[in-house]
Every structure is written in C-alpha cells, then in structure tokens.
Amino acid sequence: MPIIRRILFIGLLVVPVVSIAHHAIAGRYDPTKTIEVEGVVTNLLWRNPHVQVSMRVIGENEITQDWSMSTTSLSNMRRWQIDPDFIEVGDAIRVAGNPARVGRGLYIFNVLTDDGEEVLLGGT
C-alpha cells in the first residue's frame, strides 16, 4: 500500500475518535453530579459549537468567584426557538448543570431568570 494511502487510511480511523471526544461532555464535566449556581452574567458568546456564559458568583465566605460555563449549541437553541435575549449581561440568573471536573465551570442544562422564566436546555 503506498504511503499516501496509508496516511489517508489512518486519518480516516482517527476522525471518529476526535469527533466523539469533542462532543463527549464527560471528559470535562461530571455527568454524575448536578449543582446549582446563582450569580450575575458578565459575558455571553452566542456561537457554535457551544454557547458560552460567564458569571460572577458570590461563593462561600462571601468571596466573589468568576465561573465559565457552556451549554448546548447555537443550532439547538435556534431549533428549540430559544431567543438569545432571554438572558443578557448584567442579569441575575440561577443555573443548574454538571460541574467541571477541574476549576469553576458548569455544563448548563437549566436556567432560571430573575423574573421566574425557566429555560430547559436539553440536559439530563
């Protein structure tokens, strides 16, 4: 088998593994745990592959913590007709999701806004 064909063959074997690794949240987040975090939205990035939310949270002993969070794709948000304006920078929200295995992070699957609107984002 010529070298080019071998390289292409090996490359085709690797693509599914890389794809699965990217979409498996279990590598970065712990799907066996669910926590809730309440705070103020400091940044939003509405883009694929995952919508990103940053929050400032008052933790234990009144210490301010910055959290980085992800949720489903922008494509899913559109499909589910979730308007990006349902939360904005400066809003106080409560979120539930799977905590990061390292650091202050969360994979969000539920958002409760300050005015009582609850939005489910396809979680467990």
Residue locations for each model-derived region?
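Bacterial N-terminal signal peptides that target proteins for export
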Residues: 1-9
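OB-fold/S1-family single-stranded nucleic acid-binding modules
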Residues: 100-123
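Short nucleic-acid-contacting surface segments enriched for D/E, G, S/T with interspersed K/R
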Residues: 79-95
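Short aromatic-glycine-enriched beta-strand elements
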Residues: 47-58
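Short, structured beta-strand/loop micro-motifs enriched in basic residues and often containing a Trp
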Residues: 71-79
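Conserved hydrophobic positions within beta-strands
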Residues: 39-41
